[in-house]
Amino acid sequence: HYIFISSVQKYHFPPPTRVIVSDYNEGDSLRSLIRLLQEVEGTRVTLIGDVMLDRYHHGYSNNLNSTAPVPVLRVTNSEESPGAAAHIARGLFSMGLNVDFYSSVGDDDEGDLIIETLSSEGIQTDGIIRVEDRKTLTKIRFYGSRENLLDQSQVLLQADRGPLEDLDPRISEALTDSALGSLSSSQALVISDYDKGVISEQGSDMLISSAKKLGIPCIVDPKLTGLSRSSGADIVIFGIRGLELQKKRLMTDSLDEAASLLIETYSWGALLVLCLLYTSPSPRDHQP
């Protein structure tokens, strides 16, 4: 594991069970985030974003279809779980955080399943709006391998089911207003943006600005094609592939350079890429 900063200093530390970082000197919001991580139990977080249902089918494939060069999957087991922002809600709640969650689902079985699953785990779902005559986004993935190579399973196909029309802006506005109302009693704001309509340009700007005024940290998991909706966030989260794609788009020579440019362009406090943390130059004390 490494921490990288934009001045290209590098710190190596062993995989920790808990990491404590102090003297960040990145402003009140990041110091609040550090305290939040140190004292998680009972902390309240406002989470807003798009949700979907993840459905997985696993099996083996020993032969091709007789009429087309595609594998025939013999399904051996299936599973499904709430994804996107709903997955984040479950993760935060499992850490001991109280989550005020705001999102929308369709008026269908998939939407019911998301709400029922979250409710059964103790997560509040009052902030989830059911949209009449709308389908819940569902991502269906088929995994398979040869029967004697089950430990080498790979994705054979992904099928998406969901609405063709945009989310009514009034739904987004209502969710944003509700999230804004909960910020005064929260210790952090988390935005999970999959560009499915819950997070708008105006809404994200209002949320991030309000969080800054209240001195609470704002963490954004952004859509790579909608980074403007994360402008001003304290922490932005990428997968490593996301940073690699941005490096190509920005035509930089290194991931470090791409990270520094993104931080400057969108006024982020830091960019977290899996085990990489990019920030603006400043002294820091890292204590494993």
Where are these regions (language model features)?
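Low-complexity, intrinsically disordered or signal/transmembrane-proximal segments
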Residues: 1-2, 9-12, 286-287
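Conserved beta-alpha-beta core of the PfkB/ribokinase-like small-molecule kinase fold
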Residues: 61-72, 142-162, 167-257, 277
